[in-house]
Amino acid sequence: MNRTKLVLGAVILASTMLAGCSSNAKIDQLSSDVQTLNAKVDQLSNDVNAVRADVQAAKDDAARANQRLDNQAQAYKK
């Protein structure tokens, strides 16, 4: 009887410890995945900001070109 309780207690203790280890491994993996995703989000944010600046420069160039065309069209109408 005592031996059965001892073996049962050892099995429960071992399974609890193994479950704890696997949970820690999963938590570590998830933490690593989150860090990787955060790095990718930061990179994408930087890329969006760079593209945003390029788009604004293209808009400014287009506005200047349109203004020059408007000025030329007005010169021909006179």
Swiss-Prot record:
GO terms for molecular function: lipid binding; peptidoglycan binding. Residues 1-20 form the signal peptide. One of its GO terms (cellular component) is extracellular region. Keywords: Cell outer membrane, Cell wall, Coiled coil, Lipoprotein, Membrane, Palmitate, Peptidoglycan-anchor, Repeat, Secreted, Signal. It is found in: Cell outer membrane; Secreted, Cell wall. The modification N6-murein peptidoglycan lysine is found at K78. Disulfide bonds: none annotated. It is a lipid-anchor; Peptidoglycan-anchor. A lipid is attached at C21 (N-palmitoyl cysteine). Residues 27-75 form a coiled coil. It holds the Pfam family LPP. A lipid is attached at C21 (S-diacylglycerol cysteine). Sequence repeats lie at residues 24-34, 38-48. The keyword Secreted applies. Its main location: membrane. The keyword Coiled coil applies. GO terms for biological process: lipid modification; periplasmic space organization. Transmembrane segments: none annotated. Homotrimer. Belongs to the Lpp family. A highly abundant outer membrane lipoprotein that controls the distance between the inner and outer membranes. The only protein known to be covalently linked to the peptidoglycan network (PGN). Also non-covalently binds the PGN. The link between the cell outer membrane and PGN contributes to maintenance of the structural and functional integrity of the cell envelope, and maintains the correct distance between the PGN and the outer membrane. This is Major outer membrane lipoprotein Lpp. The lineage of its organism: Bacteria, Pseudomonadati, Pseudomonadota, Gammaproteobacteria, Enterobacterales. The gene is lpp.
